[in-house]
Amino acid sequence: MSDVFAKLGLTDQFEACTASSTFIQQLAAVQIPDSAFNEWLFQDFIFVRVFAHFLASTISSVPNDPKFSFLSETLKGGFDVLKEEMRIFKEKAGDRGVDVPELPSFSASLDAELALDSAHLLVELRQEILRFSPFNDAYCTFLAVDLGAKSSSTFAERIAVLWAAEIVYLTAFKFVLRSEQFQADAGESLKGFMEWWGGNPAFDAYVDTLSVAVRLVLETATEEGKEVVKRGIRKVLDLEVQFWDGSLSAGK
């Protein structure tokens, strides 16, 4: 676990959406109901599309400051990876008999993605996807509207939120992969899917780079700025808990 959570007093909240999450614990024990995992798969497929839009907003807000010169290319690489992630989600969903919806396609460029109206994107999703769950809608609204390109949010808040969301997945799925029960009983397809986040050196490196950026932000932030960052991270952790728990509840 990153010491950033400890410094911000968010250790318990981070644990709640990683190792202490009922969804993650059941997944690690290979006891999660298929219906709950399939619900998460369906909802997260939608979420990734909106997350890509949020990432484009974050890239556009990287300051022209030498100390952040390393960041833009890394984030652009992350944007490209999300396209592959959606393909993998769709493939795994098909393997499990889950029909994922047709979503607005990725824009050809970051500029084109930024030109999309965030609120309109969400309206389109709500109209077209009958199973767009409230917990997913809340998370997507936070990212695309509250922190979107047309919002008053800062780079500091966006990069902290991006990092928090990514390190939750990294940590949660590393926990799953370390489980002896999971390694003994899970199928190879599921193991491979979890390794996309929890066993992927490139994803480790990506999250490490985001961590460096967040530390730089906190080093120079005012007390008010630190509080804004903390609120953003705490919001992500709360929304992650709702996403895991909502998937479990919907799958009953």
Please tell me what each predicted stretch does.
Residues 16-20, 47-54, 85, 135, ...:
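Amphipathic, well-ordered alpha-helical segments in soluble domains
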Residues 199-233:
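Long amphipathic all-alpha helical oligomerization modules
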Residues 12-13, 32-61, 80-81, 160-171:
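Alpha-helical bundle segments that constitute or directly flank the non-heme di-iron/ferroxidase center
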Residues 1-24, 201-212:
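Acidic, low-complexity proline/glycine-rich segments
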Residues 22-35, 52-73, 148-151:
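Helix-loop segments that flank and shape redox-cofactor active sites
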Residues 227-252:
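A cross-kingdom marker for long, charged
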Residues 68-205, 238:
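Active-site-proximal alpha-helical scaffolds that flank and shape metal-associated catalytic sites
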Residues 27, 58-62, 146-150, 173-180, ...:
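Secondary-structure edge/capping motif, primarily at the C-terminal ends of alpha-helices
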